[in-house]
Amino acid sequence: MSKKLVTEEMRTQWLPVLEKKSEQIQPLTAENVSVRLLQNQAEWNAKNLGESEGPSSVNANVGKWQPVLIDMAKRLAPNNIAMDFFGVQPLAGPDGQIFALRARQGVGDASNTQQSRKELFMEEAQTNYSGDQTTVHSGDPSGFSQADIEGSGTEVSSYGKAMDTVKAEQLGSPTQPWARVGITIQKATVTAKSRGLYADYSHELRQDMMAIHGEDVDAILSDVMVTEIQAEMNREFIRTMNFTAVRFKKFGTNGVVDVAADVSGRWALEKWKYLVFMLEVEANGVGVDTRRGKANRVLCSPNVASALAMAGMLDYSPALNVQAQLAVDPTGQTFAGVLSNGMRVYIDPYAVAEYITLAYKGATALDAGIYFAPYVPLEMYRTQGETTFAPRMAFKTRYGIAANPFVQIPANQDPQVYVTEDGIAKDTNVYFRKGLIKNLY
């Protein structure tokens, strides 16, 4: 009697495993990021503000800054464009570490170091490495010959195969060594840096503002300083993205796309719609370069967003599935809408040049091209002038910023040595891709 391929005993044993849902690894969500920031803020408040609770009702009507700062910190985080484009990793101290774990062929020996070995998973898998190494792996990754692709040429594609039983039985012998793999864990540091603003005012201004306008100068100046710090941070992050992004590779010349020459279409509307195909191709290129995923964020000038909206490609109300006109407001929020291919579109409200920058951000806070590492959202200082006794106040914030470790840390970096630079260099970060748009209209 022939042996049954699948028995009832096998089904009883393995069906519960097959039917059980895999437990998902919970990522660091935006909510958790805010929780960590508020905790940092509360710890700073307790250590530095010196506000005591006071006995019973003695201080019942004494104003306190702790709840005010908590509210400001809560408002600050969601308005930060880094929350949409960067990975966010709150710091628990003034310095932090980030790591790049790279899988590699082989291990270090007397003739080479482990970090010099070829990295796995970033390129096509070498088909003969774990199999028969006497077979050749070369040519086009998909197996096409040069004649297939170009119409002429003699180069053919060859690929590795699995080893036969005789060679497999000899694995580990001097003539048939195992193909080996290993890992390197390379490390870099990120340090919190600061921004700060200061303001002072007279007692007379405080009294008159309250008497005539019913306004609290403390609250007004606090709001001004926090808003200015937030605006400067957003501009830093936008400029950082555009500075470090690589240029478009498939369209245009050296990252400059001329709509009149490089984009297909009979009139403006068709060309604006073709822009979406262009974005899709370049977004796929981000996925190829990073091996993480295709670009899913767009940062562009207001006029580019308006062109996409006029072409009917932006859905401002995706929950209702309604194609609505998009009113791009350069003075309003940076979020503009959702492209028909699912990409979220944000505008650079101060852009003069017409441009598009694509970015990839994954489902977790570790999966992005740049890391934003906030430490203390807001530090507040209050004092009085030494001769005028006029009120003075200042705000500071502390945060770090660094490129993804796979961008920041060179592939051949010695694992025993820390990288102390932030990895923000011109045209180097493959998680972002930029293009200037000429002759948009």
From Swiss-Prot:
What keywords does the record list, in alphabetical order?
A: Capsid protein, Virion
Keyword Calcium carried by entry = no
Residue span of the signal peptide, if any?
A: none
The primary location reported for this protein is: virion
Source domain of life: Viruses
* Localization per record: Virion
Q: Which GO terms describe its cellular component?
A: viral capsid
Prodomain positions: 1-51
Q: What Pfam families would the database entry show? A: Gp23
Q: What is this protein called?
A: Major capsid protein
